[in-house]
Swiss-Prot record:
UniProt enzyme class: hydrolase
The protein, known as: Endoglucanase 1
Entry's EC annotation: 3.2.1.4
Transmembrane segments: none
GO cellular component term, pick one: extracellular region
Biased composition (Low complexity): 319-329, 337-370
Lineage of the species this protein comes from: Eukaryota, Fungi, Dikarya, Basidiomycota, Ustilaginomycotina
Taxonomic source organism: Mycosarcoma maydis (Corn smut fungus)
Keyword line: Carbohydrate metabolism, Cellulose degradation, Glycoprotein, Glycosidase, Hydrolase, Polysaccharide degradation, Secreted, Signal
């Protein structure tokens, strides 16, 4: 009897494991917004014409990475942050299509940084239909603790995740006002507590998107549209070999030619020309916090456990003074400090890509001395996680 029982339990266990694996293959889109410098913002990570933009604490003013190569992510106590312009936005021709940025865990970072992918979604995690169930996104971060084939979407108010000190440092808005560490705010009304430039993008989730939507198959790489490059400033050198998205889109969202000259006025106009909207210079008003980098309100560090949709973190151990205790609930997740820094253990010098441009150094190693920014919070080096974000709610 005991033998039969053990066999039965083994069969049940294997069955549940297969269900889990099927779920991973299907994938989901988790979400986050931690204000950290993107992993793809570092020089030498991938064969690109220019890395992803880095901004000052106002979320608008650009920092030239070549003139300030040693500057650190705001999540590590530095002066470089995510630019507010890099929020989700809609296509005006196709009412079911949206655009945005995030972390994707497939392949090597040198192959995915600044690449664009097209994804479709079945429904959200609650089984609800989504208004925008198609997405073209640009990869700006790695996701070391995001399960394979999952996508971590940048949405303001989507959860500070493993690096909860970045947004309070950038905006002076305490961590508790950003919602749950994993999952973020729970209603569009709570978005009004966020900095003014981020409120529209926060509300977008509730009107257009959903909660951890389930992927319909695997995302497929497409040639990046002009609108994403306009906002990120990054275009891959191999992008001209990729086919564009075949659906109908408005003119601003058509595929970019090689060596596309970005139009940053989109960001300066708030993400939409002629309109004061998400991510622009219209940062006045309640809760915007200005450029206060005081790091107020570092609460909730490690207060929540690992959410659904994330695996074991890879890359560096986030044990530095800036974020050391902030990741106990989420695991570490970046491995982004260069081997050339005092504590890095990876190779500091980028290797050469097939076209002669620099790509990321080999992965591996950790930096227990300096905090490693979630979204690529420190310099190129051991590739690993970025930060992750949110659970179902």
């Amino acid at each position: 009897m005991a033998f039969k029982l053990n066999i039965g339990l083994l069969a049940l266990s294997l069955s549940l494991s297969l269900v889990h694996l099927d779920g991973v293959r299907a994938g989901m889109a988790t979400r986050y917004w931690d204000c950290c410098l993107a992993s793809a913002s570092w020089e030498g990570k991938a064969p690109v014409y220019a890395p992803v933009d880095a901004c000052k604490a106002d979320g608008v003013t650009l920092i030239d990475s070549k003139k300030d190569p040693s500057g650190q992510s705001g999540c590590n106590g530095g002066n470089k942050f995510m630019c507010s312009c890099m929020q989700p936005f809609d296509d005006e021709t196709d009412p079911t299509l949206a655009f945005g940025f995030g972390a994707f865990t497939t392949g090597q970072e040198s192959d995915t940084d600044c690449a664009c992918f097209y994804a479709e979604f079945e429904h959200d995690a609650q089984g609800k239909a989504m208004k925008r169930n198609k997405l073209i996104f640009q990869v700006t971060n790695v996701g070391g603790d995001v399960q394979s084939q999952n996508f971590d979407f940048q949405i303001p108010g989507g959860g500070l995740g493993a690096f909860p000190k970045g947004c309070p440092a950038q905006w002076g808005v305490e961590a508790s006002l950003w919602g749950d560490q994993y999952g973020g705010v729970k209603s569009a009304t709570e978005c009004s507590k966020l900095p003014k430039p981020l409120q529209e993008g926060c509300k977008w989730r509730f009107s257009e998107w959903g909660d951890n939507p389930v992927l319909k198959g695997s995302p497929k790489r497409v040639k990046c549209p002009k609108s994403l490059i306009d906002r990120s400033g990054c275009q891959r050198k191999d992008d001209n070999t990729i086919s564009p998205y075949s659906g109908k889109v408005d003119s601003a969202n058509t595929a970019a030619p090689a060596q596309y000259k970005r139009d940053r006025s989109v960001c300066l106009a708030g993400g939409k020309k002629g309109k004061s909207a998400a991510g622009g210079v219209d940062g006045s008003g309640d809760a915007s916090g200005g450029a206060d980098a005081s790091g107020a309100g570092g609460a909730a560090e490690g207060s929540q456990g690992q959410p659904e949709g994330y695996g074991q973190p890879s890359g560096g151990n986030d044990q530095g003074s800036s974020n050391g205790d902030a990741t106990t609930g989420a695991g570490s997740g970046s491995g982004s400090d260069s081997g050339s820094t005092a504590n890095g253990s990876g190779s500091g010098a980028p290797t050469s890509g097939s076209d002669g441009s620099a790509v990321a150094p080999p992965s591996g190693g950790s930096n227990p001395g300096a905090a490693q920014g979630g979204q690529g919070g420190a310099q190129p080096g051991p590739s690993g996680g970025h930060k992750k974000c949110h659970k179902k709610h």
